[in-house]
Amino acid sequence: GMPVIEAFGAEHLRSGLPICYTSVDSVFQIAAHEEHFGLQNLYDLCQDMAGILHKMKVGRVIARPFVGSLETGFQRTLNRRDFAMDPPSATLCEWVMQAGRPVHAIGKIGDIFSMRGITRCRKGSDAQLMEHLADEMRQAPDGSLTFANFVEFDTLFGHRRDAEGYARALEWFDAQIGPILAQSRPDDLVIFTADHGNDPTWRGTDHTREQVPVLVHGQNLAQNQVFDRMIPFQDVAATVAAHLGVVAQGQGRSFL
């Protein structure tokens, strides 16, 4: 993404035309300068394009705003927005909401699920998202779902193949998540996983290693348990549903 902005940023400022590009996954991205093109104009354009591209089964249209100049360099801002296709059927978020429980999204979760089944969404940098996560876990009512996505591992370090930066980010995450887990309540269930890998030491700039870890924390769980099978996303959803006592509407089965 950044090489595209660096290559066409000056032409974008001169012509006023947006920068459009695609990725190997099912996304169409539009980059534009927040000040010269206008942030709302970019959002409106992406919304219009989503109406066309979703019919072609393109999963997401992503607004990629940036600032800066050719002389000072261009930088992306935190105002990214994803315009995703509606999920084809009800998801875990909707199961929980249908049961009368709140669903609190952190990061790009609201965009990923087109705000379906989301009570509220809080955004920001990963550092801000960690603060939001700690705050949401402190005040989460019984039976609620808090769903967080930390995207900078992918955008800042994975795609850019910055192994040292990735390592520092993991160390930061480890240091931050410990106190958050320590404040969890006896009946809380915390699951760490990802939707794909992105090895910063591998060639190219695309996602890698689709088999990602599933780590589970809970004060009432058996310690050091190792699952003896692959765990698909649908089983993660079924597990959370079973823990919360809501009806699972998918094909998954709980692994706990």
Language model feature labels by segment:
Residues G1-L256:
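Feature captures the catalytic ectodomains and active-site-proximal regions of enzymes
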